[in-house]
């Protein structure tokens, strides 16, 4: 039996709605879904969506003995959908901390995190700007990589949520080597790809056009590529970002230098179907690739597709790992 820990994220957003809709469509055989979240939020979403699932409330993940849907009821706020606050931010943190404890103790096979608000978790006193940095620190991960993916395309990021003006200074030969080595290793282990084909993007227009438009390609990216090839890793020279994705069928993963460079094409190809996975953690962690959806919360129009994909990916990765 595959046992999945699912954090509800911010209970005032669309999370309860999309989770019920997703669970209604996901497979039930030999899988237990353990939700860390608010009973009141889920009950409210049940009335909103008309999705009436058999969810058993338990005190601990240790109480799970067979397949099914379970709830560990924590920080049970009487929320108004679309109305977020420090309290809903705090609730998000409580769900996350409890789930991560169980995952680190190997009581669950994977972690699926539903969206949180960076603003409200930080205003509630949480010292991290999001899930990933927290998960890396509490798990002791020395190196990790953010990968967004769908069935057509996978993209890893060298830099993530930083201002564009700070990107060049954050790109180093050492960082590229470290992250690509991690990606190569994790794609072998997690996805069963014996020799991943990796495409790396340049930073500048036309990958600098031989140093005529910037020099990061010649001074940083190409030397990193040379070292990686000496390791036996199959990786391209830095590709011109504006045309690189035309060849997406030729590669297992792209490595982008910054957030929008990699995610604009991904979301164009895979809108509502993309999934976030964190490589380098000692456990499987996936999440849907969207936010809390405060603006549409409570309207019963939220699309659960990305959550379904996130859960299905976690199940697949668990089975590949066996």
Swiss-Prot record:
Sequence positions that bind substrate: 131-132, 267, 276, 285
**Main location (coarse class):** cytoplasm
Give the metabolic or biological pathway: Cofactor biosynthesis; pyridoxine 5'-phosphate biosynthesis; pyridoxine 5'-phosphate from D-erythrose 4-phosphate: step 4/5
Q: Where does a divalent metal cation bind?
A: 161, 206, 259
SUPFAM superfamilies reported for this sequence: Isocitrate/Isopropylmalate dehydrogenase-like
Catalytic reactions of this protein: 4-(phosphooxy)-L-threonine + NAD(+) = 3-amino-2-oxopropyl phosphate + CO2 + NADH
Write out the entry's keywords from A to Z: Cytoplasm, Metal-binding, NAD, NADP, Oxidoreductase, Pyridoxine biosynthesis
Q: What is its EC number?
A: 1.1.1.262
**How does this polypeptide assemble, per the annotation?**
Homodimer.
Q: Which NCBIfam families match?
A: pdxA (TIGR00557)
Record family assignment: Belongs to the PdxA family.
Q: What else is known?
A: The active site is located at the dimer interface.
What is this protein's name? 4-hydroxythreonine-4-phosphate dehydrogenase
Which organism does this record belong to?
Answer: Sulfurihydrogenibium sp. (strain YO3AOP1)
Q: What gene is behind this protein?
A: pdxA
